[in-house]
Swiss-Prot record:
High-level lineage: Eukaryota, Metazoa, Ecdysozoa, Arthropoda, Hexapoda
Recorded name of the encoding gene: Gr63a
Organism of origin: Drosophila melanogaster (Fruit fly)
Membrane topology annotation: Multi-pass membrane protein
Residues exposed to the Cytoplasmic side: 1-129, 188-222, 286-324, 372-436
Expression across tissues: Expressed in the medial aspect of the third antennal segment. Carbon dioxide-responsive neurons coexpress Gr21a and Gr63a in a pair of chemosensory receptors at both larval and adult life stages.
Protein name (Swiss-Prot/TrEMBL): Gustatory and odorant receptor 63a
């Protein structure tokens, strides 16, 4: 067994020599189609162990083992082409899925994510599965419950006769019911989400084949904490809001708690997915920089280019898989934040009251959720593309052969040609610019609404009914005032036109 290991080490040393470097580079050169684009699959999703037996001879994982007196397996041993990757004790399958599984588990409880998964790379959406049937039953029951609550809220809105800001608070409770529409949207996107999970499993196998170790994501503990703490905070915020802004009715608080937990956990789910991409991109950049210290054939650079292309595709697929869900989420959060801040600012003129506590909590909670959605997506995009480009630009090409330099240049070109932004199906890029744009638009609407609020007492003057004006009354009074002004203007014009001729005639009479 020792001579075989010595033979491998010797071959590795010969690969570093200038005499046979170009020959080995040509020998290990890949087909252009396999090394260039995104359809790179693992050699076999059930064949990660074959990596150790000559599949990727010059990747950094094997180089480190050789430096650490690693004894390679005997050359006459048969390659385990049909063995599974999970049989290798060093390979840990489904790392990504296991890290976000606590959030998936919570979402499945509230009937949101009916995806069946029978093993690594075997996630799918089935309409005849028990998970989907449970999701449909849960949605129907929740829809009936929400319909009952919405009917009561509509009656409250119709019976309002107070100031306009009180109507805004009533509308706020009505808008809080809208997240129930997210559940059927996620049914529509469940197949794309299942494909995203499968692509992550394939990426993990490819990462193991190239780097020599499993993907070291360590997000499960954070996911467990989020799955426990976030629902508690969400329920507390809903209860405090109902206590301070309306009469507390337990029967009507329950659906609000479920829907608020739905939006909060979807935000946490998005946060963990983007965090996993950021950590993976950082690890890949560090491994690639370390791999460049080992002089080897140019195929090693091509391996990492293929791996980066797969990660870049995962970044884009994340936005496409959750396209309509997060478009709806962004619009919903924008609407809720605008209404809550307007209600808060319109009542501050009378002093900070108990209703302002609920409005403040609602505004801060949803602003924080929107910020984390945009910020984590921005951070993931920067790590996948910008930071990786910095690593490539810092590579010293002087000591590399021409083939390796060509591969580095192709790598840089690939990072420029393949965008790594998280785009929601072409609607918008999810990044900090989106958050800034929504806030700017929000300020514009708030200025208009506050001007509308300030103009109410000026139109009614000092009349006794000024404090009980409704929105409809204000609009009708504004129209009456406009019509009165137009009538007065027309009358004055007619009077001037009819009274001007007599003075002229009198002047002519005097001259005569």
């Amino acid at each position: 067994m020792r001579p075989s290991g010595e033979k491998v080490v010797k071959g590795h040393g010969q690969g570093n020599s200038g005499h046979s470097l170009s020959g080995m580079a040509n020998y290990y050169r890949r087909k252009k189609g396999d090394a260039v684009f995104l359809n790179a699959k693992p050699l076999n999703s059930a064949n990660a162990q074959a990596y150790l037996y000559g599949v990727r001879k010059y990747s950094i994982g094997l180089a480190e083992r050789l430096d650490a007196d690693y004894e390679a397996p005997p050359l006459d041993r048969k390659k385990s082409s049909d063995s599974t990757a999970s049989n290798n004790p060093e390979f840990k399958p489904s790392v990504f899925y296991r890290n976000i599984d606590p959030i998936n588990w919570f979402l499945r409880i509230i009937g949101v994510l009916p995806i069946v998964r029978h093993g690594p790379a075997r996630a799918k959406f089935e309409m005849n599965s028990a998970s989907f049937i449970y999701s449909v039953v849960f949605f129907v029951l929740l829809a009936c419950y929400v319909g009952y609550v919405a009917n009561n809220r509509i009656h409250i809105v119709r019976s309002l006769s107070g100031p306009f800001e009180e109507a805004v608070i009533a509308y706020l409770f009505l808008v809080n019911i809208l997240p129930i529409m997210i559940i059927p949207i996620l049914w529509y996107e469940a197949r794309k989400i299942a494909k995203l999970f499968n692509d992550w499993d394939d990426f993990e196998v490819l990462y193991y084949q190239i780097s020599g170790h499993s993907l070291p994501l360590k997000l499960r503990q954070k996911a467990v904490y989020i799955a426990i703490v976030l629902p508690i905070l969400s329920v507390l915020s809903v209860v405090i809001t109902h206590v301070t802004m309306s009469d507390l009715n337990i029967n009507q608080v329950v659906p609000y708690c479920i829907l608020d937990n739905l939006t909060a956990m979807l935000g946490a789910w998005w946060f963990l997915i983007c965090e996993a991409m950021s950590i993976t991109a950082h690890l890949l950049a560090e491994r690639f920089q370390k791999a460049l210290k080992h002089i080897g054939p140019a195929a090693m650079v091509a391996d990492y280019r293929v791996l980066w292309l797969r990660l870049s595709k995962l970044t884009r697929d994340t936005g496409n898989a959750l396209c309509y869900t997060f478009v709806f989420m962004s619009l919903y959060l924008f609407f809720i934040i605008t209404l809550s801040i307007y209600g808060l600012m319109s009542q501050l003129s009378e002093g900070f009251g108990i209703k302002d506590i609920g409005l403040t909590i609602t505004a801060l909670w949803n602003i924080g959720l929107l910020f984390y959605i945009c910020d984590e997506a921005h951070y993931a995009s920067v790590n996948v593309r910008t930071n990786f480009q910095k690593k490539l630009l810092m590579v010293e090409l002087n000591w590399m052969n021409s083939d390796a330099q060509t591969e580095i240049n192709m790598f840089l070109r690939a990072t420029e040609m393949n965008p790594s932004t998280i785009n929601c199906g072409g609607f918008f890029d999810v990044n900090r610019t989106l958050f800034k744009g929504l806030l700017t638009t929000m300020v514009t609407y708030l200025v208009v609404l506050l001007q509308f609020q300030i103009s109410i007492p000026t139109d009614k003057g000092d009349s006794e009914g000024a404090n009980n004006i409704t929105v409809v009354d204000f609009v009708m009074d504004s129209l009456d005032n406009d019509m009165s002004l137009m009538g007065a203007s027309t009358l004055s014009t007619t009077t001037v036109g009819t009274t001007l001729p007599p003075p002229i005639m009198k002047l002519k009479g005097r001259k005569g």
